[in-house]
């Protein structure tokens, strides 16, 4: 049986919020079967919990924000991408502020944290959501689609009219039956343009942003001394974001996601449309792991 997974141990990290610029303490904790990923604002009394579900997404400007009443948790997508990539079904994410720390701008540090905590299999079947038919949302020239696929595949195309990006790969397709999330996707960093940063800071966004936690691009090139981690790092980061956003379904996917210029808002619209169209998906479990189409879920042996 493919079993649900949680963390073996509690693990902590400290970082800075990308948009708030605040110092944040992050604690990842094991959680019981069928808990899902639950964010907890430990700085509040009483502590406020926000399950990582599509229905709890309140804002999608520059990042994905979960809300419960007037309490929010910003920038959840990179951590959720790491949870998805390592197949973590159940965990508590405790925060000392309203934003998940940005770390280095990728999911890499979160992958390292989760692997350091260790993975533990639980005595219950892991639930997958299998896409049964096409579901699409569009907004102007932007598009996001789910398609049936025996495995998990994410295809993405960006279209930036910018001298640096025009000459780089702007599309990628990753089939996780043959590609490692950890090696090929998790280290792709978020990116921003110098021309936008002044505007963002005026609106109290990207206050914690720097070349330490983002790829910064001006008209002439990439400002980061070490350059890019992947030739197609820009579009790979959009794939990373999408994987995190899709994990708000609450389960791992069996299907294909295709995005064209899609972002957090359209990704969330797609999830809500899928959930509403109950004939477009089904929940499945696997008694025999060898019959499952998803192998990328087992990158590390769970003890």
Swiss-Prot record:
GO biological process: lipid A biosynthetic process
Domain of life according to the entry: Bacteria
Keyword Metal-binding among UniProt keywords: yes
Chain positions recorded as Zn(2+) binding sites: 78, 237, 241
EC number of this enzyme: 3.5.1.108
GO molecular function, one term: metal ion binding
Cofactor(s) required for function per UniProt: Zn(2+)
Transmembrane segments: none
Residues at the active site: 264
Pathway: Glycolipid biosynthesis; lipid IV(A) biosynthesis; lipid IV(A) from (3R)-3-hydroxytetradecanoyl-[acyl-carrier-protein] and UDP-N-acetyl-alpha-D-glucosamine: step 2/6
Classification via Pfam families: LpxC
Catalytic activity: a UDP-3-O-[(3R)-3-hydroxyacyl]-N-acetyl-alpha-D-glucosamine + H2O = a UDP-3-O-[(3R)-3-hydroxyacyl]-alpha-D-glucosamine + acetate
GO cellular component: membrane
Keyword terms of this UniProt record: Hydrolase, Lipid A biosynthesis, Lipid biosynthesis, Lipid metabolism, Metal-binding, Zinc
InterPro entries to which the protein is assigned, alphabetical: Ribosomal_Su5_D2-typ_SF, UDP-acyl_GlcNac_deAcase, UDP-acyl_GlcNac_deAcase_C, UDP-acyl_N-AcGlcN_deAcase_N
Entries under HAMAP family matching the protein: LpxC
Family: Belongs to the LpxC family.
Known role: Catalyzes the hydrolysis of UDP-3-O-myristoyl-N-acetylglucosamine to form UDP-3-O-myristoylglucosamine and acetate, the committed step in lipid A biosynthesis.
NCBIfam families recorded: lpxC (TIGR00325)
Protein name: UDP-3-O-acyl-N-acetylglucosamine deacetylase
Annotated source species: Pseudomonas putida (strain ATCC 47054 / DSM 6125 / CFBP 8728 / NCIMB 11950 / KT2440)
């Amino acid at each position: 049986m493919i079993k649900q997974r949680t963390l073996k141990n509690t693990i902590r990290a400290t970082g800075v919020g990308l948009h708030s610029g605040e110092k944040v303490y992050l604690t990842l904790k094991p959680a019981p079967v069928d808990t899902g990923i639950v964010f907890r604002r430990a700085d509040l009394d009483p502590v406020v919990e926000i399950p990582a579900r599509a229905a709890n997404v309140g804002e999608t400007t520059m990042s994905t924000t979960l809300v419960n009443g007037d309490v929010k948790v910003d920038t959840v997508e990179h951590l959720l991408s790491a949870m998805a990539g390592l197949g973590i079904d159940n965990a508590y994410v405790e925060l000392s502020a309203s934003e998940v720390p940005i770390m280095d701008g990728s999911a890499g540090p979160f992958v390292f944290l989760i692997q350091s905590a260790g993975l533990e299999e639980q005595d219950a079947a892991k639930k997958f959501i299998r896409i049964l038919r096409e579901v699409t949302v569009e907004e102007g020239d932007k598009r996001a689609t789910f398609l049936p696929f025996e495995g998990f595949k994410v295809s993405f195309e960006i279209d930036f009219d910018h001298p640096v990006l025009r000459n780089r790969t702007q599309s990628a397709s990753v089939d996780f039956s043959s590609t490692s999330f950890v090696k090929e996707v998790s280290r792709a960093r978020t990116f921003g343009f110098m021309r936008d940063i002044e505007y963002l800071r005026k609106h109290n966004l990207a206050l914690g942003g720097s070349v330490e936690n983002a790829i910064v691009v001006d008209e002439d090139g990439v400002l980061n001394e070490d350059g890019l981690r992947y030739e197609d790092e820009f579009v790979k980061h959009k794939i990373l974001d999408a994987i995190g956003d899709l994990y708000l379904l609450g389960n791992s996917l069996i299907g294909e996601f295709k995005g064209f210029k899609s972002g957090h808002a359209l990704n969330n619209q797609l999830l809500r449309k899928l959930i509403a169209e109950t004939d477009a998906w089904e929940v499945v479990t696997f008694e025999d792991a060898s019959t499952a189409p998803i192998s990328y879920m087992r990158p590390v042996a769970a003890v």
